[in-house]
From Swiss-Prot:
This is Heat-stable enterotoxin B. Keywords: Disulfide bond, Enterotoxin, Secreted, Signal, Toxin, Virulence. Belongs to the heat-stable enterotoxin family. It is found in: Secreted. GO terms for molecular function: toxin activity. It holds the Pfam family Enterotoxin_ST.
Length: 71
């Protein structure tokens, strides 16, 4: 009985490990683009200049905002 339980535990463990490796290998650009956009948005939110500064394109320069001409 102990051998059966051990075999089941090992099978479950290997299934979980292989499932995580397979998922991480199949990440494509469709998933990484929204993540990059979120990181850029957070960087823009944390680096807002003071209202006295006259640089209107600060977010484009800091974040490479896709709405701007680009970097």
């Amino acid at each position: 009985m102990k051998k059966i339980i051990l075999a089941l535990v090992l099978m479950l463990f290997s299934f979980c490990t292989l499932g995580q490796e397979t998922a991480s290998m199949h990440l494509d650009d469709t998933l990484s683009a929204p993540i990059a956009a979120e990181i850029n948005r957070k960087a823009c939110d944390t680096q807002t200049p003071s209202p006295s500064e006259e640089n209107d394109d600060w977010c484009c320069e800091v974040c490479c905002n896709p709405a701007c001409a680009g970097c």
